[in-house]
């Protein structure tokens, strides 16, 4: 009887191990697929180019850096600013950059350069957030400093976000579903001859230029005014400066 009980328990454990292996393999495959979709994001490509070129610069050849979100890297153009101020500047903004990330961007800059001036772009809608995984991951994708990345995760990530970060399907799900939805729509249109509802023509262009700057003169279509309007239903009395972001700005 004890032997039968042992065999039964062993079979149960074996089944559990096999199940976990299958789940692990499937999870890894899904994660790789999701990451591949994220790699096709053109905004990520601009960020990658911005940082790749920064790492190629001669040490201590940059005396001013711009740090912030897309508001920064689409606004402060070193090609215009440097001839006027006599500076040698670089744009190091990243999409949706929060100020915990700004702090670590500057720490990485100081490993290679000794800028005399640092221009930090502030945006009210980001100042109220405690943490945002996607913007942190965008920075990690271009950061060539594992110890700094580990320090960021240890000091900034809430516990539940540390778990999510190590699971690719969760980390990259936003990129994947945005990419996949577009692919599915295109295939349906081609297969069934379905005509999608006409959307306003996008006026303007966006491209990476130089020294971290991204040129963008795209005009927002009218149909997006309500969808992306951050001031819609906004009451300034309810706005609060998040303590986490405040802490990193004060640093």
Residues of each region from the PLM?
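Alpha-helical transmembrane signal-anchor/signal-peptide segments
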Residues: 32-53
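Hydrophobic membrane-insertion alpha-helices, especially the h-region
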Residues: 11-32
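A short, well-structured juxtamembrane/interface segment
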Residues: 49-55, 244-251
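Membrane-embedded segments
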Residues: 67, 71-158
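Short, flexible loop segments at the rims of nucleotide/cofactor-binding pockets, characterized by
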Residues: 40-45, 67-68, 94-98, 240-241
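Secreted/periplasmic serine-hydrolase-like ester/acetyl group-modifying domain
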Residues: 138-250
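Short extracytoplasmic
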Residues: 48-76
């Amino acid at each position: 009887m004890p032997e039968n009980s042992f065999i039964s328990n062993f079979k149960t454990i074996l089944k559990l191990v096999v199940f976990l292996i299958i789940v692990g393999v499937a999870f890894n495959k899904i994660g790789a697929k999701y990451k591949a979709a994220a790699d096709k994001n053109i905004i990520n490509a601009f960020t990658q180019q911005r940082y790749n070129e920064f790492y190629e610069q001669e040490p201590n050849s940059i005396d001013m850096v711009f740090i912030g979100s897309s508001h920064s890297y689409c606004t402060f153009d070193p090609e215009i600013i440097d001839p006027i101020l006599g500076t040698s500047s670089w744009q190091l903004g990243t999409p949706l950059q929060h100020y915990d990330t700004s702090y670590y961007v500057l720490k990485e800059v100081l490993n290679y350069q000794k800028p005399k001036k640092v221009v930090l772009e502030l945006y009210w809608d980001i100042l109220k957030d405690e943490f945002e995984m996607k913007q942190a991951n965008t920075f990690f994708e271009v950061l060539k400093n594992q110890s700094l990345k580990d320090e960021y995760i240890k000091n900034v990530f809430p516990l539940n976000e540390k778990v999510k970060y190590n699971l690719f399907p969760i980390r990259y799900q936003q990129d994947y579903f945005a990419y996949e939805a577009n692919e599915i729509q295109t295939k349906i249109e081609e297969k069934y001859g379905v005509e999608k509802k006409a959307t306003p023509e996008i006026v303007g262009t966006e491209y990476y230029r130089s020294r971290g700057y991204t040129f963008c003169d795209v005009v927002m279509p009218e149909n997006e005014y309500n969808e992306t309007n951050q001031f819609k239903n906004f009451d300034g009395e309810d706005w609060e400066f998040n303590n986490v972001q405040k802490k990193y700005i004060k640093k």
